[in-house]
Amino acid sequence: MGKASKATKKFTKNHLKNTIERRKQLARSKKVYGTKNRNSHTKNKLESGTNDNNKNKEDLSKLYSDVTTSNTSHEKDGSEDISVLNVNSKGASLNQVSTQKRRSEKDLLAAIAYCQKLSGTNQADALWKNVEKDLKETLDNVDFDARSKILQDLRLEYAEILLTKFNFEKKGYQNLSSALDTILHIKKFSKFPNGLVTQLCNIFVNHSKAREDIQKAVNHICKIDSSLSVAVFQVFYSPLLDFFKSSPSEVNDFDTLEELQLFLIELLSLNSRFYQKIAFAYLSQLDAHLKRCLKESESSDAYKLIYNWQFTLSLRFWLHVISFLWNDYESISKEISPIAINLTLDCIRLIPTEQYYPLRLHLLKSLVNICRSTRLYIPLSSQFLEMIPFVLRRSSPLSDDKEVMYNFDMYSTLHVPKECLLSKSYRNNVRKEVILLMTEYFAIFSNSIAFPELSAPIIAQLRGLVNESAPGKHVLTFLNKLESTFSFVESRRMNVDFTLNDTSQVEAFEKDLDWRSTPMGKLVSDTT
């Protein structure tokens, strides 16, 4: 291969250095926890005797939704504190004016019209003549700024009434349109409109036709005051966690789940600083649960904090966020991605047994998606290598009844009983998913100048196992394409006259070599 050979070896060594160090640290951590006295009892020991069949539906919403204020509070760059509405000596807030009883829709319209009249907008007398006497006197005696603050509160209260009527009247969508128009006229909030945002969230989840209007309203709230973004996000993130209690196949309204996730991602995209703060905070929460699981390793049920649908789908959501926002906020995503990726790999390594291969495949699928969306190299070969002996191992056939019983859908499964490991159907399902993910993963980097070094371990192990078993058509096809791509890239780099330290030349090489033109790339293109 000439000059590129030594440089390629050096490139591979440096590229995997951080990964090797991370694995050593994880191994040392597990060794420390493993040497503890197994007979001791922890004060916070998880409740024993929990039915293993129900662990995937354990409700951990509070753990995963709570975010420390210090981690997520948005800096205001010197803007005033919006938690309390302060009015000067000549003014008053709406909360200081006759709040003993809730105003009717008619009273609110009259008050809004009178505020606009005092501000110079022409209003018919019939619109404002019924304004409350106390409120009228207050509005007459305050300055323009104080009156504007009262007007915003009146509009907020009016919008909440319209949204309440949305669910109980036939003209619900007409009320929603009026509420949206009112919200868009609000220029500032005296405090976080929790009632309003909660109503918007409930309508978004339960009424698909209203989602576009709800999205406009929420975007407006976050844009006029970015410090409210965290609280708004938390309100909408809560129902998402409710969806995450069960597997995706058990969700009654999958479209709502998808649209809610996309809406939250769009909400994060409104502000780069908000995206950075909220992502760090929630990923830190997930990481804290993993550390708690390791600390409580003496308990046989400690792993249930991590190995459940809520944790898995929450982690996958944040991996999806990184993939989706990479192009818009690349620098921030590069800071966040190592946390999410290392957390995912550590979760996989927590219980790396064959029973939990479905969970591993769920997480690997998200990591492969990041590789595809960002072209970020994540060393996943070892994760695939561990599963290859199992998927190619020969097993004695079980009875037809047991085979049907153990024919799990990988999409709706995180783990399987130990008896299922003998099932041919389970092994076939795992093999299919492993080959599919490996094909996509290696196709992504099939134009990399280091592809031969990347694929060599997989080729060596697969070739040895294939000779000892009946691998099947898909495995042989994958192996042949992998070897062909190995030779293809090696031949293309044979005569290069630069080293891998010359990043501009490396990038030019990989840019000229379209991954779709490689044997592995063509295999993916043909199957999609």
Curated annotation (Swiss-Prot):
InterPro entries: ARM-type_fold, Noc2. Its main location: nucleus. It holds the Pfam family Noc2. It comes from the Eukaryota. Coiled coil: none annotated. GO terms for biological process: ribosomal large subunit biogenesis. Keywords: Nucleus. Transmembrane segments: none annotated. It is found in: Nucleus, Nucleolus. Residues 1-16, 25-43 have a biased composition (Basic residues). Residues 1-59 are annotated as: Disordered. GO terms for cellular component: Noc1p-Noc2p complex; Noc2p-Noc3p complex; nucleolus; nucleoplasm; nucleus. PANTHER family: NOC2P-NOC3P COMPLEX SUBUNIT NOC2 FAMILY PROTEIN, NUCLEOLAR COMPLEX 2 AND RAD4-RELATED. Belongs to the NOC2 family. This is Uncharacterized NOC2 family protein C1B3.09c.
